[in-house]
Amino acid sequence: LRKTTVEWFYRWVGFSVANGKHKWIIDIYNRITPLPANHMMLYTEPWCAATVSALGERLNLTEYIYPECSCNRMIALYQKNGRWEERDDYKPQIGDLCFYDWQDNRVGECTGEADHVGMVCDVSGNTFKVLEGNYSNEVKSRAMQIDGKYIRGFGLPNYAKAAIGYKVPVDKTNIRTMAGQVPYLNIDNNNEAVKMAKILFNSLGFNAGTDTIFDE
């Protein structure tokens, strides 16, 4: 489930304020029920926490990826549920949330106010990568050092519990969202078109396979 969640996040890479696709993320966030802090987000607000929350909403995982539009209120939820890791030298797993404090002075454990959040998408040796919404106004990744500067701590969604009987929910709104992005398929379409179609169908919860051969 960790891998599935991260793979879904990768589909949003490149969504930005410039191309307007960040609005799609915020729209998903605003359909969370009940809406955190009873606050409907505007498209002009910071949207890093809303991005990981929207991911949880899209995958029906809000019981484990606690939704919030505030980084600090999100931290409080992980602390309350015993899913918080304070240590900067913690080696994260993919799917964990990394919180940042840009005022970190590297004196002891960072316990300041959180300014930003993303989801760990890769771990290799003493480094890890984090996928983030609202990173320079778009969704993209950042490389970090374990026990590095600016780490406020980690939120640890309980994927083991969430995975029991889990299936990715079908969201028919994605058909409208992605309409026009996938070419119509004919017998003579090339394999790339087929691959794009399979990505769409797999994203909707269907098993369209992974090969790119279009059989008659």
Task: Say what each PLM segment does.
Residues E138-D147:
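A short macromolecule-binding patch
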Residues L42-P46, R87-D89, I213:
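Residues at secondary-structure transition points
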